[in-house]
């Protein structure tokens, strides 16, 4: 240590961390009691700056490529040491936390941050255990040093900032970036690598449970409605983003929520609205002169966020766990306006659409994404976070669906009646009515209509939903144009799917090009 004047603050409470964050000028208190912090130029994830150390213990199991980029082991050691030296003469904040609400499948993690607000974020999003590391597992370490500037020529990084995961040494290094979401997503990637080896499917999904103990999962990319739809006043929340599905049940990987705030309203999202209070971290939310958050303001970024612990949600499952799911919902945001609002999937179709991960980048969480909306295919509804080959996760999904008998649905939260710019987006009440019917089991044995081009079965009637909306061709004025757009979408699916080596039963389960 340098001159001895620096301090290591260990396991501070929410109140202490907020107090220190304010005293250190890291953020401001808002009118609703939340702490608001700005992240500077990086207001989302930086996929180009994310690496995994290439080393013998994990190398053969990782799908190397543009998502999982290799980093040299000796370069990692040198950079880790440099960052530790950088922090040696600074105050740091440390907590002993866990990732995974499962006695068997948790990972203990020691989180060290340069900023108090980053430590508060970690304590909100990870699990603060009553007894740390009860099973005495080897401990992971995260270091987050936003003040450290990487030098690519010296450090081997892509830019002045980096996120590097080292499986052999159980270390995660974050340097040069303030966007706190990188911390949670790096540990999600860690669990996504570790869990399949134990027969557990890690999932980029939200989960809730009814009064009768029936679990529903919602898969989807950022902005498709995972957080909004799982925050259901009639049900109990397990979690909003990351879960594991083991034989016998599902468990939350996290201890908090990271909700998008853009256009947040008390009317449409009361559960999230009420969770934003003292102890919550608001990221890049603009406030007025009275410190009242303006959730419509996207001047800093579309990707404004609220990070709060699950304790801020009244209706939640206290143990962060649930039974295996009766219903599994794949949320897709279709910008072409072609997909129906809901379809029932066979297990082969479920594997096909899980591997495809078709959706749109709406208010994308990635750096450099503007408000422009484009369609994308993101494997397993979360390609940026899955280190193993996609087939590993698809196989596990089919296994779990089959052994429990879960029914899978494809729900379009995007456009109808025309593409983005011409058609209109399904409103939240319509999607909620569809989800209510799924959750109650009403759609399990309902009469369906077959859409040949899309190779999908759609219900002919759903309580509380205008039947005209159910078959998308009925919402388009120009039926010829609909057929053209449907053909184009089917071709896109087919072209994207060519990279997968899977049985014909899965290959043929997609749209008919």
From Swiss-Prot:
Catalysed reaction, written as an equation: oxaloacetate + ATP = phosphoenolpyruvate + ADP + CO2
Entry's Gene Ontology cellular component terms: cytosol
Annotated Mn(2+) binding sites: 185, 204, 241
Names of required cofactors: Mn(2+)
Record-level Gene Ontology MF annotations: ATP binding; metal ion binding; phosphoenolpyruvate carboxykinase (ATP) activity
CDD domains listed in its UniProt record: PEPCK_ATP
Biological or metabolic pathway of the protein: Carbohydrate biosynthesis; gluconeogenesis
Annotated coiled-coil segments of the chain: none
Cofactor remark: Binds 1 Mn(2+) ion per subunit.
Binding of substrate, residues: 45, 179, 185, 305
EC assignment: 4.1.1.49
BP GO terms, sorted: gluconeogenesis
Keywords from the named record: ATP-binding, Cytoplasm, Decarboxylase, Gluconeogenesis, Lyase, Manganese, Metal-binding, Nucleotide-binding
One of the Pfam families matching this protein, by short name: PEPCK_ATP
Binding site for ATP: 185, 204, 220-228, 269, 305, 431
Subcellular location: Cytoplasm
Family, as annotated: Belongs to the phosphoenolpyruvate carboxykinase (ATP) family.
Assembly, per entry: Monomer.
Role noted for this protein: Involved in the gluconeogenesis. Catalyzes the conversion of oxaloacetate (OAA) to phosphoenolpyruvate (PEP) through direct phosphoryl transfer between the nucleoside triphosphate and OAA.
Protein name per Swiss-Prot or TrEMBL: Phosphoenolpyruvate carboxykinase (ATP)
Species this protein is from: Shewanella pealeana (strain ATCC 700345 / ANG-SQ1)
